[in-house]
Amino acid sequence: MSSSRPFALALAALSLSLLCVCPPAGAACAGASAPVAAGRSVYLEDLTWMELRDAVRAGKTTAIIPIGGTEQSGPAIVLGKHNARVRWLSGRIAQELGTALVAPVVAYVPEGSTEPPSSHMRFPGTLTVPPAVFDATLTSIADSLRIHGFRTIVFLGDHGGYQKDVARLAHRLNRRWAPGTRVLAPPEYFQASFEGFAQILRERGYRADELGTHAGLLDTSLSLAVDPALVRADLLHAKGVRFDTAHGVYHGDPRRATAALGRLGVDEIVRKTVAAIRAREQR
C-alpha cells in the first residue's frame, strides 16, 4: 500500500465527520437528519440534542423553566428545597401535559442584600443574585428555548419572593416575541402550593399557626412528599430544636408534617397548574 493511502483515508474520514457539524439554528445537520428514538425523560438535561430535536418536531413544543432558589428553610429542611421541589413538580406537570419538556432548574434567585445581609441572607447557605441578573438569566434561557423551536415557554416559580417579577418578565417577552412564541407565568402554581394547599389542611383540622408561611407544617409536608431526604425528620421531634422566626421558621410549626399530607398539596399543584397552562394555550 502506498504510504500516502493511510493519510488519504484519514483525511476522507475527517471530511465526512465535518459534515455533521451543526449549521446555524433552524437548519438540519448533514449526516444527522434521521430521527433517533426519543428518550422517555421529560427533563431536557437527560436528552441528547437529537432526542430533543425530534421531540420538538413530534410536538413537544412547550418548555417549562422551573425556578427555585437556594435558601434557609428552618432547622429541618435542606437549603435546596425549592430546587428539588420545583424540578419534581415540573416533571409531573410536563407528564400530564404530554407536550412539554423541563429545562434545568434556575437555582439562583434574589434572596436579599449582602451588605448588610437582609431577609434569608442572614442565614448561612442562602445564595442571592441581583434582580437584574435574575431577569437577564431568565430572558436568556427563554430565548434559547425559543430559537430551538419551543412555542410555549412556561415559568414556574416555587418561591413567593419573585412571583411579580416573573409575571412582569413574561408580559414583556410576550410583547417582544408574539405571535410566534407565547410566554406564561401561571400564578396558579404558587397559589396552589400556598393558599390552595393551606385551605385543604385547614379543612382537615390543622391550625393556621401550624401551617406557617415558611418552613412550617405546609412547607415541610410538601417537601416530605417530594423527597423525604429533603427533611431531617429526626429533628422534628428532637428536644431543644426551636421552630421560630429566629431559627428560620415563620409563623408555623412543622412537627405534625407528613408525606401523606404533602401528597394532597402535590395533587392540588399539578391539577391546578396543568389546567391553567392548557387554558392559556387555547386562547
Where are these regions (language model features)?
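Residue-level detector of alpha-helical hydrophobic segments embedded in or interacting with membranes
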Residues: M1, L18-L19, A30, T61
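Bacterial N-terminal signal peptides that target proteins for export
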Residues: M1-L11
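Selective for proline/serine-rich intrinsically disordered segments
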Residues: S4, V21-C22, S33, I64
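Compositionally biased, low-structure terminal segments
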Residues: A8, C22-P23, A30, Q191
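Bacterial N-terminal signal peptides
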Residues: A10-P24
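Extended, histidine- and acidic-residue-enriched regions that form the cofactor-binding/catalytic faces
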Residues: A28-V154, D158-R283
